C-alpha cells in the first residue's frame, strides 16, 4: 500500500465516521494501520479505531486497539486514549492494564493490585435498559465503575449492581448547592443478588419514613419511597437539574432491596419501635 492510497482510505474512514458507520470506519483505519502503524498521525487513527469499536460495544477490539493508542499517547496529560483504554480494560477484567491506563491519564489510585475498590465519590448514572432510561445514584469504585445506591424502578435492574459508565457527563444534578455529574451507562458489569420488593407503609411523620430508610441502609439494603421519584423529560434530564428531597408522610408504596424474610423482620422492627404512626402491608417481590 502506498501512502497516497492510505490517504484515500483515511478519507473514506472519516466519511464513514461522519455517517456513524462505525464498523466500516474502524475497518478502514485498521487496514491503513496494518501498513503504517507509526506514522505521525497513526496515534490518532489508533484512537479513532478503538473509539469506533467502543461505540459498537465491541470491548475486545476496543481493548486491543486502545492499547496501541495509549502506547502512542503522552502520559500524565489527560489524553483520552488512556481513559478509553481504562474503560475497555475494566470490562475485560485486566486490572493491571486498567490501573496503568488511569495512571497514564493522570489519576491517582489507591495502592495495590487487582480490582480497584476506591472511594471516588457519589455520581449519577443514566441506566439504559432496552431503551428505558432511569437516572440513579452510584458510589464510584473507580473512574468508570459504580455501585447502584437506589432501588431502580426499571424492571430487571437492582440495588447494589455494579455498572460501568462513560467518562463524559451528559447532565448534572445539583443537591444543596453541590453539583454531581450524570454519566451514561455502558454496561452492567456485576448483577446484584438482592431482589426488589414493594410494600405499602403508613408513616405518621416524615421522620418515621426516614427511620425506615435508615434501618435498611444500616443493614446494607435499600429503601426507596415512591414519593422520592421524579419524572423528567430527556431535555431536562440531560441538562443541569436542581434536585430536592420530596418525601412525605402518610400511606405510600416503598421499594425495598433485601431478601424477603429479612425485609419482613426489619419492617416489623420498624413498626414496633413506636406505639402509633407506623404500619405496613402487602409486601411482595417485583424483581
Feature locations, PLM:
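Start-of-helix register in tetratricopeptide repeats
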Residues: 7, 41-44, 78-80
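TPR-repeat structural position
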Residues: 22-23, 59, 95
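TPR/TPR-like (Sel1-like) alpha-helical repeat modules
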Residues: 70-71, 87-111
